[in-house]
Regions:
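Active-site helix-to-loop segments that bind/position phosphate- or nucleotide-bearing substrates
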Residues: 1-71, 75, 185-188, 211, ...
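Generic amphipathic alpha-helical segments used as scaffolds and interaction surfaces in large
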Residues: 9-12, 69, 73, 77-85, ...
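Conserved active-site and cofactor/substrate-binding residues in soluble primary-metabolism enzymes
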Residues: 20, 58, 82-85, 89, ...
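Internal, well-folded beta-alpha domain core
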Residues: 73-131
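Short terminal or interdomain "cap/linker" segment that borders an active site or interface and mediates
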Residues: 105-181, 188-190, 211-223
Length: 223
């Protein structure tokens, strides 16, 4: 909660309201992370990387819409910021999962629009049919709290925290920018809302694994 207050420039008297909204929204989060291993090609030149898709699910969107439709615009904005922090926790757990399972270290989170163009997204989303995340003609994902990014990896241990997104982001004018320092290729894996990594039914013949939502957000209370 304190991190959200600082990062998104809320007044201190909003602490209680933000904490309450965190409590209300967390049970509605159906966080899922998917990734597909790729090698360098003519369009993306990383030697080895994962195409990653992270989503909070549809219920979180509906909660934000409910507040907005009832003209509770401050609360809707707070929920949007809370959702961004939930997404950040999901990125962190996905990177840790890949490191633990494959002994590969992520070198950066590469969001489309920086090194590679946004119009690549439609083609990359073809890897994730059947996940419930859709893309429209404007390259917007639904549910809205869904993000696709590239995770280049190395066999050498990385000391830097690749999930410090501001470190690698080219938008130096962002109002929320934080100060720096303050198995088979093409198989799809899933991290979703069950308590541990398990085998799961194949999706179009592609094997997957799962990771729990409570594992993603454990020990986050009060931060």
């Amino acid at each position: 909660t304190n991190k959200i207050i600082r990062k998104y420039h809320f007044a201190g008297e909003n602490t209680g309201k933000i904490a309450s909204l965190c409590d209300v929204s967390l049970p509605l989060v159906s966080a899922a992370c998917y990734y597909v291993w790729k090698k360098a090609d003519t369009e993306i030149t990383y030697d080895e990387y994962a195409v990653c898709l992270v989503t909070l699910g549809t219920a979180f969107d509906k909660l934000v819409d409910l507040y907005a439709e009832n003209n509770c615009l401050l609360e809707a904005y707070m929920l949007d910021c809370i959702g961004l922090e939930f997404m950040s926790r999901s990125y962190e757990q996905l990177v840790k999962h890949i490191q633990t399972k494959y002994c590969k270290w992520g070198t950066k989170l590469d969001f489309l629009g920086d090194a590679y163009p946004v119009d690549m997204m439609a083609r990359l989303m073809e890897n994730f049919t059947g996940t419930g995340v859709l893309i429209n003609d404007e390259m917007m994902l639904k549910p809205l709290k869904s993000v696709l990014f590239l995770l280049p990896v190395s066999d050498q241990e990385e000391k830097a925290d690749v999930c410090r997104i501001c470190t690698n982001c080219g938008n130096v004018n962002c109002m929320f920018r934080e100060e720096i320092g303050s198995e088979q290729q093409n198989s799809i894996q899933k991290i979703s809302s069950i308590p541990k990594i398990n085998s799961m039914s194949k999706n179009n013949g592609i094997p997957g694994g799962s990771y729990g939502i409570r594992q993603i957000f454990k020990n986050e209370g009060g931060k």
